[in-house]
């Protein structure tokens, strides 16, 4: 009997996450450090110097019936050898509509469309050569997942819900993930 209640509560929490007001636009500068990990003394540590990329991004929301669509662009600023590589993404509010993504390759002066996987296969590729996939960059739709509240916990002295998100059978065919665990700040 408690299981459906937890599922309903988890879905309501995720709806609040998606509905939060994050403004009609955003400008940011981000540093992304990635490395190959190895296990050492029961801990994961970088096996080499991290690869560091700095990029700037701009996002703008556009009102549509029932919500908003978003357009964003990201440009690599560092390292110098990759400066000017860009990523453009359109996210759509409409359920079932995939994001559109393009990559600008500065050295070639060319734009390449990043093709979504077909309806029966996930999208492949990594974002700016990191562990982050193009799927991770797309907007999430509430109905593409089922949710389960696993527990409440504390992270850095802040209360959190720990929620498992499992893709629906239809969405699972297009996803690289069988489930994800999300820590949601309760405030």
Tell where the protein language model's regions lie, with residue ranges.
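N-terminal mature ectodomain segment of secretory-pathway/periplasmic proteins
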Residues: 5-107
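A short, amphipathic edge element
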Residues: 8-11, 52-54, 137-150
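A short, polar/charged loop/turn motif at coil->beta-strand junctions and beta-hairpin connectors
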Residues: 22, 68, 141, 157-159
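Preference for bulky hydrophobic residues occupying beta-strand positions
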Residues: 30-32, 74, 147, 165, ...
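Long, terminal "pre-/pro-" and other extracytoplasmic accessory regions
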Residues: 36, 148-154
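A generic structural signal for short beta-strands and their flanking turns/coil linkers
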Residues: 70-72, 143, 178-180
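Gly/Pro-enriched, hydrophobic low-complexity segments
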Residues: 100-104, 110-116, 121-138, 152, ...
């Amino acid at each position: 009997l408690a299981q459906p209640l937890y599922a309903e509560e988890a879905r309501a929490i995720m709806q609040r996450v998606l509905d939060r007001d994050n403004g009609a636009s955003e400008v940011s500068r981000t540093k992304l450090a990635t490395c190959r990990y190895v296990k050492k003394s029961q801990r994961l540590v970088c096996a080499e110097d991290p690869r560091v990329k700095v990029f700037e991004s701009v996002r703008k929301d556009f009102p549509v019936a029932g919500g908003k669509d978003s357009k964003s662009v990201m440009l690599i600023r560092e390292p110098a050898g990759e400066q000017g590589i860009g990523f453009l993404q359109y996210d759509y509010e409409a359920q079932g509509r995939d994001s559109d993504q393009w990559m600008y390759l500065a050295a070639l002066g060319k734009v390449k469309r990043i093709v979504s996987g077909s309806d029966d296969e996930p999208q492949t590729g990594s974002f700016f050569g990191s562990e982050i996939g193009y799927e991770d960059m797309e907007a999430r739709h509430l109905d593409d997942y089922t949710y389960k509240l696993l527990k409440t916990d504390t992270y850095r002295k802040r209360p959190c819900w720990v929620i498992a998100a499992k893709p629906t059978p239809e969405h699972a065919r297009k996803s690289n993930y069988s489930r994800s665990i999300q820590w949601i700040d309760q405030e």
